[in-house]
Amino acid sequence: MTGAEVETGSQAKPDKKPQEEVAGGAERESEAPLVVRPKVRPQAPATSGARPKTETKSSSRARPKTETQSVSGTRHRMSGARPRSEAQLMSGARPKTDARAVGGARPKTEAKPIPGARPKGDAQAWAHSEFGAEAMPRAERAHLSNSVTWPPVNVGSATVTKSKSLSMNTELASMGSEIFSGTQGQPGIEPWFGPREEANMGSWCYPRPRAREETSNESADENSTMSSFWTREETSIRSWPREEVNTRSRHRAKHQTNARSKPRSKQDPYIDSLSGSEDEASNPFCFWAGENTNDMFRARGRDEANARPKIRTKREDYFEDEDEIYKESWLLPGEEGNRFRRRDKEEPNKTLKNENEKDVKNDETVEQESRLEEEVIIGSWFWAEQETNVEAGASAICDAEPGAEEGAIGGSLFWTEEKPSLGAVARDEVRPESEEEALFGSWFWDRDEACFDPNPTPVYTAKSRYRDPEEDLNLASRPKTWDEVTIEFKPPCHGLGFPSPRPFIIPEGASGNSEEKAKNAELGAEGEEQDSVAQRDLPEPEFPFQYDPSYRSVQEIREHLKARESAQPENWSCTCIQCELRISSAEFEELLLLMDRIRDPFIHEIAKIAMGMRTASQFTRDFIRDSGVVSLIEALMNYPSSRVRTNFLENMVHMAPPYPNLNMIETFICQVCEETLSHSVNSPEQLTGMRMLRHLTITTDYHVLIANYVSGFLALLTTGDARTKFHVLKMLLNLSDNPMVAKKLFSAKALSIFVGLFNIEETNDNIQIVIKMFQNISNIVKSGAMSLLDDDFSLEPLVSAFHEFEELAKQLQIQIDNQNDPEEGQ
């Protein structure tokens, strides 16, 4: 940055290059507001040959610790006056001050120009008391190469500073300055204030010792950006020209003592440089170094000084180098546009208005003091949407944005540690707070008051989206058996005129797998998402029974049947029960309707077989397939069928003789036997009947009933083809296991027919079946079951038949061997 412009009157003279820093503070001693007209005198240019590092260490960063003579932990409160503290600095100790600024505490990176103050060179500082009094001291010519702004401490009637030259390496940690009460001046130091101004305002600055600063000009410039922020941050949130530098009771100033012009690219835009020393990179006060963040942010106590003057230097209108933009920001991404907007070229000169305009703005500032105090107490440490006009704490231009002054002063882009420092003296008098509150502040979200709670209540409590199983588990309310479980269905039969169904009781042992559809989660009255409650929402045409989990639901069966109908028959291959029974979609829907109308358990068993809920023998499945499941149910229930019955079932119904002493199944079996024998030999209807009877004889329940028709079936062994013989032999093989029918089965006529099957022309399967039949009867004879059942039973026919059977078996074996090896047979 080149030399600073010095303005005399209302005309700026850029040729002036002062090396002084002027900082004034108006000390409020009475209730009446005091407005001091700043006096401006031209400054003598600096004659330093080398450009020293002139960034001043802001007391808000260095935090000079004021060892008060009052009791530790207490705070002096004086109505209408700033608290006085007889301060004595301890040599060798790191200075430490309170973070509260007088009148309107501003965050460390904010500077707000106040109307009525006239810029003076590069070193600009306006003192503003907590009640709106502004004063600018009359600066005498003092060749102070570097100075540190110091909070106003009234000791007696005047304050004289005494500097000690220390090593710059330990300047920040061990810089000592003793403040003595008196009116005599120190030798070698010219007074900064006039005689009548010094008594009212006190000393705001003290000369900072410079040991090796002139020897490290270049390194100081390179390290100047290592300020209170980390190195990745933009060193300027918003470019401040020298005319706009303005703070309320904690202003900064920076001296440019270098006479030669040297452009600065990355060192010019400062936010708040802590120090201009060459050891800035290793500064223990540097932000995010990890060891001094508490010293930088937290207010130590209420009894300390309430202001931290800060350093602000900025001549350029905007960044001179684009490298400044890439650095990260303190603020949210949404604030980038506000912070980095380019300023108009005329904007730096907007503050150079005539004195009439500035006087008017001074009056407005005094009138807005009550508003300012409220803004100071509240602060603006919220998110971007709260204080976007403040531009993240950066000071706005006086003439362009006069309304944002209060928000900018009270604003802060830091976290909640700085909120206690925004209260200033007005906050001390309005709201006394605990020491912990001043130290820690509020760690909560916006609109929370600064408080210290060891167990704070969070703003938002995360709740589980899913219900805890233990909450729903209630063993006392759970059903003990399936009989206690009732499900009420809503089938579509009501629209067809059928009576309303009663609640269906699931039988014991049945597995429940009814479809459940969870309703979408609804938002409660408070906008919080409620747990989704699964409610039973069964479709109207759904089959009102529970299925085993291994089987498909009604909707899945519907989709499967529709897919089968849309596919080509030759391309469709499926082994499910519906495909095996050849149930169509229309027939399946009729079956569901019948299930709602009929309560007969036997009909329900047939329907369960068709649905895949019950396993059945191959005979039963074949019978249902050949007759049709709907036609079969309608025939059994004597319901008028809505379809044309199959010829097989129709003939069975009409031709069946009345059997009043037999149940429905026995009557049906008798009808099947008579229908099978009555059909022509080897006809499809006869084969269907034989297949049905073969499956019916798997169990012994109907053996005696079917044995009455054995003579007719034996006749088929002599007249039928190989396929017919196979089905007849399979049925007789099932009967051979039962001793009750063995006498009829192994009669003399039957044995001769069986022996006649042992020939070379008979198929191997049929011969194997006959052999198994003789083995079964042999086992029955050996067990003695035949003699127990029938005393008149004779074994002679069986013995002769067995001998003949053995001879035929040997001859058959020889014939089979000869067919396999013709040469050996010859």
Curated annotation (Swiss-Prot):
Residues 59-73 have a biased composition (Polar residues). Residues 1-126, 204-286, 336-371, 506-534 are annotated as: Disordered. Residues 13-31, 231-247 have a biased composition (Basic and acidic residues). Keywords: Phosphoprotein. One of its GO terms (molecular function) is amyloid-beta binding. The keyword Phosphoprotein applies. Disulfide bonds: none annotated. InterPro entries: ARM-like, ARM-rpt_dom, ARM-type_fold, GASP1-3. Transmembrane segments: none annotated. May play a role in regulation of a variety of G-protein coupled receptors. This is G-protein coupled receptor-associated sorting protein 2. It comes from Mus musculus (Mouse).
